[in-house]
Amino acid sequence: MRASQSPMLDPRARQLLRTLIARYIRDGEPVGSKTLAQHAGLDVSPATIRNILADLEDVGLLSSPHTSAGRVPTAHGYRVFVDSLVQMQPPGEEEVRRLRAELASGNGTQSLLGSASQMLSAMSHFVGVVSAPRREQFAFRHIDFVALDARRVLAILVFADNEVQNRVIEPRRAYEPAELERVANYLNAQFAGRALADIRACLLRELRMAKSEMEQLLAHSVDLASEALVPADAEDMVMAGQTRLMGVQDLSDLDRLRELFEAFASKREILQLLERTIQAPGVRIFIGEETGMVSLEDVSLVTAPYAANGQVLGVLGVIGPKRMAYDRLIPLVQTAADVLGAAMESPGTR
């Protein structure tokens, strides 16, 4: 979480703000001074509470709906709450067991990502989202080349996590089947278990240093690998539970909901937001306008990077209304990131 430009609040104001936001998140109704007098645990009169609430409204942490005598938090109020007032409720043992069971090591990467997004959605009751690792970060296990015609070659890549990608490439020249087999055998023997970027760089380096008898094979390998081992445009993000937001009271404006679902469909804006958080350790929270995207102004996004073997692979998180249970969802997202990262360290997935 990041620090915010928060006003200095005395202990009574902090306690009232904490109680008001917690009650509003729970009930979804504006909170008045009488309710706070009963539940804030302060020995002060309702009149004093009203004065403090007025001060909190003056500094932009609360607002007063026209139809109610109570108050509700603003986006700034939520920011102060998550940065300094929220009291975390980590997932229970049963929830952690569920996560570990669903994200069991040994499953393929795409299966793990799908399970992670579904579990986040089910446990948050909102939208679960997981950005996929770039294929360039994965080791490849095996490659085959099949000539399709005089100019096109099918490259079949099997990665260490058992995912298979088929890529049609157009090398600089036509290749005989025997040549393709020779190049595939060379790449498999020399580079199985290494990441794609490492292989391309190593091939170019070896070509510069090669002796004459190796130059032709290396040149052919560079020609084919320059296209076959470039990361393909794959599924960049997995989402689950989008329709859960259709029944959320705070997201009842149909025009804004339509904009939100268009962002879900295109994925581009959300993926860009996730990319902004990939190098930031721990949980990050974007509340409303903090996302920088009009389509996401009515929601909050709670994210955390997941990593395996010391390498950050992607980001996962929950998208929901600003009125969400931050105390529960912040530690849930961090736990899910830890469990997914541990599963990705398995030999069956990396």
Swiss-Prot record:
The record's keywords, sorted A to Z, are: Repressor, Stress response, Transcription, Transcription regulation
Write one Gene Ontology MF term: DNA binding
Keyword field contains Zinc-finger: no
Can you cite a GO biological process for this protein?
A: negative regulation of DNA-templated transcription
Q: Does the keyword Membrane apply?
A: no
Mention any Pfam family matching this sequence: HrcA_DNA-bdg
The record's section on InterPro entries has: GAF-like_dom_sf, HrcA, HrcA_C, WH-like_DNA-bd_sf, WH_DNA-bd_sf, WHTH_HrcA_DNA-bd, WHTH_transcript_rep_HrcA_IDD
Q: What protein family does this chain belong to?
A: Belongs to the HrcA family.
Q: What does this protein do?
A: Negative regulator of class I heat shock genes (grpE-dnaK-dnaJ and groELS operons). Prevents heat-shock induction of these operons.
What HAMAP family does UniProt report for this protein, alphabetically?
A: HrcA (MF_00081)
Question: NCBIfam families attached here?
Answer: hrcA (TIGR00331)
Q: What is this protein called?
A: Heat-inducible transcription repressor HrcA
Organism, by scientific name, is Xanthomonas euvesicatoria pv. vesicatoria (strain 85-10)
Lineage at the top is: Bacteria, Pseudomonadati, Pseudomonadota, Gammaproteobacteria, Lysobacterales
